[in-house]
Amino acid sequence: MPKTVVVTHPGKPINNEKRFRFELLYFCVILLMVVGLAAGYFMWMMSFSTHSPNKGLHILDRSEWLGEPPSGKYPHLKLPVSNIIIHHTATEGCEQEDVCIYRMKTIQAFHMKSFGWVDIGYNFLVGGDGQIYVGRGWHIQGQHVNGYGAISVSIAFIGTFVNMEPPARQIEAAKRLMDEGVRLHRLQPDYHIYAHRQLSPTESPGQKLFELMQNWPRFTQDPTSLRLLSNETVKIVTRPYWLAQPPIVPLTPLKLPIESVRFVATNTPSCFTQAECTFRVRLLQNWHIESNGYKDINYNFVAAGDENIYEARGWDHSCEPPKDADELVVAFIGPSSSNKKIALELIKQGIKLGHISKNYSLIDDLEKS
């Protein structure tokens, strides 16, 4: 009987083993490529984060703080912008996100309902929690300082900083926002920083924050160039702002156009903040009325050390003897080159408005005092 021969096929298991090894190798190569790409992307992101001005900057958009939509249209900013104006909100501060959101909604409601604005007036606000809250953003003109919305971006610190400094993280967040503005080409690299008080009769952004600002690299001490851009070269603090009392009796009209301007010294201590200078001007008015028997403060304007012009009798009313009734009298609290420069700008404005003759004469009694 013939034997049955069983033929085996040793090649098949060998082929399966080779295929398994090949697939394993292929899988490992793909895995290594994915891991390599992920690692490379991670390193790139780490490098980007390290060198980006955006590192640590957290911005909450309007939808995140539940802002109301604008009630109307508003004009766009021409970018990049060259000027930053720093404010404080003159409200309570906030250290936590939920409190800052509440402050944002309150400020927006106040601006829209009390001022009649179409939206919150600031471009950005900075919370004490170290976060940025978007107001009107980079693209829309603000209503933060009258006449300057088209040529500046406003950054308001949430809080009141007359007697206390903002926390370090609030200041750092504002600086990072400005760096981000340059990176995004929303700000010019050589932008200028100003305080609200340099452009308007206000304490904003508060004395303590203003003192800190003066150490910032891009802070600009002289606001003349910005005033020229806004067609405003002189900041006049009107009588209601310094809480002037009314004249005792009606004043004598000043004959226009004025042919002569006289600079005189008040011979009183200097002042360097609006609060101090307002106090000095009010003391002068009280002294002139109660001690000297004048009808009112006996100057037309007062140039003070805070680089503001304070309206006294103004353009329309003449001073009393021993002053010449036909002269415009500008008094100086602490005469200096800076407030003398502003007084000369006041004269230019007076000529432009038709109050002062183009051929006026200037009598400078400051040199005698």
UniProtKB/Swiss-Prot annotation:
Belongs to the N-acetylmuramoyl-L-alanine amidase 2 family. Peptidoglycan-recognition protein probably involved in innate immunity by binding to peptidoglycans (PGN) of bacteria and activating the immune response. It comes from Drosophila melanogaster (Fruit fly). Gene3D superfamilies: Peptidoglycan recognition protein-like (3.40.80.10). GO terms for cellular component: plasma membrane. CDD domains: PGRP. The chain crosses the membrane at residues 24-44, 144-164. It comes from the Eukaryota. This is Peptidoglycan-recognition protein LF. The gene is PGRP-LF.
